[in-house]
Amino acid sequence: MLDFKGRLQLKCQRFMNNNQEHFTNDVLRTDWEYRINLPLWNKEPKRHDLERLIQRFMVHLNRKIYTKKELRRGLQVQCLPVLESEHTNPHFHILLKVPASHRLNSKPDKTYFIKNMVLQLITSLNLVSLHRVDPTHTKTFQVLYDAIGAVGYNLKQGIEQIDFTNVRLANSS
């Protein structure tokens, strides 16, 4: 028979497992459209600094894609950032799903517009020297055809590598 502390620990463990299961289901149900591979050379390998960097990147990306009115309504890019090789070669794999917006509807090619915005942001925020790392931009920005395979690749080092401070799975509008 379990004592009070044992029952409480068991209850907390069940709660965490249930939340993790719901999170995994939400991630797998999302139809991810793009992946950004973002190497962070010459960056301090402190996790909170890297998370703040990704937060700035996502805020700027949302401002480039959505109007102020859409942002006030809660429209934003859905993202799943995962940090890999935190201490040796820090880099993020970010899955994106971009809901329709006024600016996107006025562009003839949504993918080309988003790719240009992402590459401009990487350059303007001095995240990495793109012409050295990926001169053709084929590794930095990728269109996804297999969303579940991309999630599997992103989570290959485990769920603890997810940057939960910057995860956005649904719009709040």
Model-inferred region functions:
Residues M1-Y34, N42-I54, A100-S173:
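Catalytic "initiation/cleavage/transfer" segments centered on a nucleophilic residue
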Residues T24, L75-E84, T140-Q142:
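Short amphipathic beta-strand and strand-loop transition segments with alternating hydrophobic
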Residues R52-G74:
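A short, contiguous, amphipathic alpha-helix enriched in charged residues
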Residues Q78-H102:
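Histidine-centered divalent-metal-coordination microenvironment in nucleic-acid enzymes
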